[in-house]
Amino acid sequence: MGRFIFATLGLLLVAFSINGAKGCCCPHDWLTLKGFCYKVFNEHKTWNDAEMFCRKYKPGCHLASIHSGEESTDLAEYVSDYLKSGGNVWIGLNDPQKKRSWQWTDRSQNNFYPWKQGEPNNRANNENCVELWSPLGYKNWNDESCASTRAYLCKCRF
């Protein structure tokens, strides 16, 4: 009897391990990338409203942080495929104290800044949020007024 229970528990452990190895569980309409799930939402919101939407969608979700050229390229391709009509897209980088000190809403490290040429420029002293720039294929960033409305990219773990 003891061996049966031990064998059963062993099989359950193997089954759970295999399930977990799938990169578990992004919803079918989300992009899975390096352990995270990403989704573009095309309902235009201000930057603050977009961040709040991501947070309410699931605890731990935020507007997307981007940390490498590879991640940026993969997300640019995903966003381009999803938003056929174009339009810039909010990400989770902002300057909450308006001192040109950029921070991710998920509190991750700032280590990658593919600004489009001439950016960030803080035009009209009012650009404290960051968007993926559509005319350059979503691979570069632009600072923009947080009150502007845009599509947005959420990043979660499920």
Swiss-Prot record:
Keyword line: Calcium, Disulfide bond, Lectin, Metal-binding, Secreted, Signal
Coiled-coil blocks: none
Gene3D superfamilies in the cross-refs: Mannose-Binding Protein A, subunit A (3.10.100.10)
Protein name, entry field: C-type lectin lectoxin-Thr1
Residues the entry annotates as binding Ca(2+): 127, 142-143
Function per UniProt: Mannose-binding lectin which recognizes specific carbohydrate structures and agglutinates a variety of animal cells by binding to cell-surface glycoproteins and glycolipids. May be a calcium-dependent lectin.
Pfam families on file: Lectin_C
Family from the record: Belongs to the true venom lectin family.
Signal peptide boundaries: 1-23
Motif (Mannose-binding): 119-121
